[in-house]
Amino acid sequence: MDSQAIDQFQMHGQDIPWLLTHWAEQKPDHPALVWAPRDANGPRWTYAELLTDVKRMAVGLAAKGINPGDRVLIHAENCPEMVIAWLACATLGAVAVTTNTKSVGAEMTYFAEHTRAVAAITQPAFVGMLAKAAPGLLWIAVTDNNSGEPPSQDEQTASEAHDRFDALFGDSNKFVPRDADPMLPFGIMFTSGTTSRPKAVVHTHANAIWASRIGPRNIDLGTDDTYLIYPPFFHVNAQSWSMFAVLGVGATAVLMPKWSQSRFWPVIVEHDVTHVSVMPFAMAALGDPSRPKDNQLRVGVFGLLLPDLDRAFGIDLYACYGMTETVTHATNGKPSDGLPTGSMGRVTPGYEIAVVDQDTGELCSAGETGELWLRGTRGIQLFLEYADNPEANEKAFEDGWFKTGDMVKMGPNGAVFYQERDKDLLKVGGENVSAREVEDVVGQHAAVQSVAVVAKSDDFLSEVPVAFVISATPDVDQAAVTREIMEACEERLASFKVPRAVYFVEAFPTGTLDKILKKELREMADARD
């Protein structure tokens, strides 16, 4: 029998609406979603109320011409409207395309055209830009506010030319359930890798069910626990690591508009938060000696096992590694597992792991650094595909193994140690940035002969992009060229992708076959002010 068909059979009859319905029947009055906007107490939804609003939205979307398989852009900062619309698309059988709100118009044009999105849901802050970037959309629906903040007069005027989000709600009594199809796509997130354009990662309902099963086990999340979600909801951390983990056990999600150091602990205390994802910029708040003692926080979902931080923060940091393509945690480790300090834990059951020498294609021995490869069923443990990108799909997989681009080594007791990421992929404050995408923009300037973009260490964001440039002429006005490069990048790239500096050099350090040694460029960048 076909192993992939057997894997899919295990998900028979299960999808996102099945999951929502289960908890609405089992725990109708238990809080599912709590909105925690800035300086205010927001509304909350029980599981019964959440299912009702999701059905109402699904009915309304269908009435607006959205059919199963259609793709709907959701371009918004964290807000309950975004979560409800995301779940409603899944319930209807449509595909929610959640996009980064730092994206500029050119990027939104690409997202809309590449996914062939038919409609969009957004906020007043973005509707003007989105309408210009994607004029082919059938309609755009706009929320009344920007994640709890009132719109400006210009934003209000722009919003009035489009549908109101609240007008999308229909009559839940008219909802007609569809047959469950676990392998049906439900969501698309864009991720930057080593290619020049972000790739559209397709997740299925089976991916969601997998995340809802595995996520809670990996982080000891129980039905009476509460997970604080502050990472952007257009990222896999918020969607799969957090929200689907909550839905897997009927727990509670508390949603913040975005990271706020001043609101972090008050929200945790007020809502008895037990679990939180730990991003680099949250470390200072967790280690604040004046943090309140009367809190229930006990688990931080982090990348590595670091007992010293456990003691400093007064919570347990669970090691979890994954990416958009792995849906949830592909490795995991708990302080009680007895694994070495600094490891990412062990491979999560359901995935297979290999550490491969990139030059020879052979397995590395324990202690040797190689590329991390993962194997699982596509559409269950791993993403289904990169949408409409056969070249990227072919390049990403080899004999069923997904090549992550991350360099690791195996240690004692199956522990995995992170070494470095692919030289052409940067991680800026949690956002993936393709060096090649930035290089493509910088390299179009007439004064640039060659360009190499690398990461420079940053205290707050971990790393930021910088560009090393070889000029096409010897007497170039470096200040003027730098200014023009920055302007071009700001026009065409999201703010986190824009180089923080341009360094002019006479030559790049190179190795065999004249390959640019980006590691040396990173060291050169860190040595500069």
Please state what every model-predicted region is.
Residues V59, A63-K64, T91-R164, D272, ...:
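Structural core segment of the AMP-binding/adenylate-forming
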Residues R44-A48, F186-W210:
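Conserved AMP-binding A3 loop
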Residues G93, I209-T226, F234-H275, T348:
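Conserved AMP-binding/adenylation subdomain of ANL enzymes
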Residues D29-C79, V83-L87, V104-T109, H205-A206:
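Conserved AMP-binding/adenylate-forming core of the ANL superfamily
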Residues T101-Y110, A120-T122, V276, I353, ...:
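AMP-binding/adenylate-forming catalytic core of the ANL superfamily
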Residues A58, R71, E77-V97, T101-G105, ...:
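A short helix-loop-beta submotif of the ANL/AMP-binding
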Residues P28-P31, A141-V142, S159-D163, F169-F190, ...:
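Conserved pre-ATP/AMP-binding loop-to-beta segment of ANL
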Residues E270-T341, E352, L363:
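Gly/Ser/Thr-rich phosphate-binding loop
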